[in-house]
Regions:
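Flexible helix-coil transition and linker loops at the boundaries of alpha-helical arrays
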Residues: 17-21, 53-77, 109-111
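Residue-level signature for tetratricopeptide repeat
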Residues: 35, 90, 123-125, 153-160
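Structural motif corresponding to the intra-repeat A-B loop/turn of tetratricopeptide repeats
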Residues: 39, 94, 129, 160-161
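Structural signature of alpha-solenoid helical repeat junctions
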Residues: 24, 72-79, 96, 114, ...
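Long, ordered, amphipathic alpha-helical scaffolds
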Residues: 152-234
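Alpha-helical repeat scaffolds
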Residues: 13-18, 45-52, 97-105, 131-144, ...
Length: 234
């Protein structure tokens, strides 16, 4: 009897996750989790994604066998990658930074080009669990076009030295919409925000709020950081 999910090599030295039954149809399982989330049952959505991730993990070889490059052009394999990312985000939002980081590291091992943009979430996970050397290792991959880079640099400086370097605060202040979001007393996720962030071309202000809301989970681990940062921003 064939397994419900199996790893199949391709001619391009990558691998595909082939589904041989309903349980192996990762696209359908991902869609089922989205439907649960849209209906308001977020707990079930997270559980569905994590169970699917466990099946994916069981299909991949052990770590000592080396990374398995996945073929993201194959729909079921791409769904496996999307499930891994979504489950990692679930765990990050739940405060399970170590689990989320392990999931994201696995995802990047399977495709180091990072087509799903897992690196920013991984950076936040490293910040959450205080893995500053790991964060430094991937800082270059974040690039210099996101406020997340100077934000996490400031956090590392604050936690490890007790102060934020003025040059870092200046770098962050260049992201005016994000700086404004940091200074706000509240960060509403009302219908107006939902419409804006889900539009084809969300505003910079909406994107800044989205980044803040995502980063807030990690930043709240260090309760004195935000007030110290805002005090230095111009």
């Amino acid at each position: 009897m064939r397994p419900f999910l199996e790893l199949q090599p391709t001619a391009n030295q990558t691998y595909r996750l082939i589904g041989n039954s309903a349980r192996g149809n990762l696209n359908a399982r991902l869609e089922q989790s989205y439907k649960a989330e849209q209906s308001g049952d977020y707990q079930s959505a997270c559980q569905l994604r994590y169970e699917a991730f466990e099946d994916i993990l069981a299909t991949l070889p052990d770590d000592e066998d080396g990374a398995v490059p996945l073929d993201r052009t194959h729909p079921n394999t791409l769904a496996a990658m999307e499930i891994t990312l979504a489950s990692a985000v679930d765990n990050y939002l739940a405060g399970e930074g170590e689990i989320a980081a392990a999931q994201l590291e696995l995802l990047l091992d399977c495709d180091d080009e990072d087509p799903l943009e897992a690196t920013p979430i991984l950076a936040l996970c490293y910040a959450m669990i205080g893995e500053w050397e790991c964060l430094e290792d991937i800082e270059q991959d974040l690039g210099d076009k996101t406020a997340l880079t100077p934000l996490l640099r400031a956090l590392k400086q604050f936690v490890t030295t007790g102060k934020i370097e003025s040059v870092t605060a200046v770098q962050l202040s260049r992201y005016k919409e994000f700086t404004a979001e940091l200074k706000r007393a509240d960060h509403p996720t009302d219908e107006a925000y939902a419409r804006e962030i889900n539009s084809d071309r969300p505003s910079r202000a909406a994107l800044a709020r989205e980044l803040y809301l995502r980063a807030e989970i990690a930043l709240n681990i260090y309760p004195q950081f935000l007030s110290a940062l805002v005090a230095q921003l111009k």
